[in-house]
Regions:
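N-terminal helical cap/lid subdomain that shapes the substrate entry/recognition surface
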Residues: 3-12, 17-96, 115
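Glycine-rich active-site/cofactor-binding loop and its immediate structural neighborhood
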Residues: 101, 111-112
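Short amphipathic alpha-helices and their capping/turn segments at secondary-structure boundaries
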Residues: 1-5, 119-122
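Short glycine/proline-enriched coil/turn segments at helix->beta-strand junctions
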Residues: 71, 102-106, 126
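Short, charged, low-hydrophobicity "junction" segments
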Residues: 49-50, 105-108
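Substrate-recognition "cap/lid" segment bordering the active-site pocket of phosphatases
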Residues: 107, 114-144
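Small/polar loops that bind or transfer phosphate-bearing groups
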Residues: 21, 108-109
Length: 144
């Protein structure tokens, strides 16, 4: 195994990285983004979906487009889209042991919110292993 003792800082992406994409949590977030746009802008589902993808391409995140084009308050958007069912994931002892064995500080970096990171990493049984979360708000809403 490679000697990792010289590394003093680890940064982990959250969604579809600390848990398998097959859990489909991000699919639920994606669907909630469309629903949010549909409700907020009072437009048809198809139009909301098209706008969601357009904003993602043009602004780097759907939220950035909504903030710029419609004055959407980001915390409200993040709370709404991250209100998801976490039952597809469960405590991952092997992942916890692997992260715990790494030397140095450990951080979660996410385009989501701190609350979302706490909820997901908590469900995985690993949140306590991290020193902090760097979320989209800490990044001044600039996506990774």
């Amino acid at each position: 195994m490679t000697d990792l003792r010289h590394i003093d800082c680890w940064v982990f992406d959250l969604d579809n990285t600390l848990y398998a994409a097959e859990c489909r949590l991000f699919d639920e977030i994606d669907a909630r983004m469309t629903a949010y746009i549909k409700e907020r802008l009072a437009i048809a589902h198809h139009d909301a979906r098209t706008l969601q993808k357009d904003y993602y391409v043009r602004y780097g995140t759907t939220m950035a487009g909504l903030m710029r084009e419609h004055g959407v308050e980001p915390d409200h958007f993040l709370d709404y889209v991250h209100d998801i069912d976490l039952s597809p994931i469960s405590e991952n002892v092997a992942l916890a042991n692997a992260i715990n064995a790494l030397p140095g500080r450990k951080y979660i970096y996410t385009n989501g919110s701190v609350a979302h990171a706490e909820n997901v990493a908590g469900a995985l049984g690993i949140f306590h292993l991290f020193d902090d979360v760097f979320d989209i708000k800490a990044a001044d809403y600039t996506p990774k």
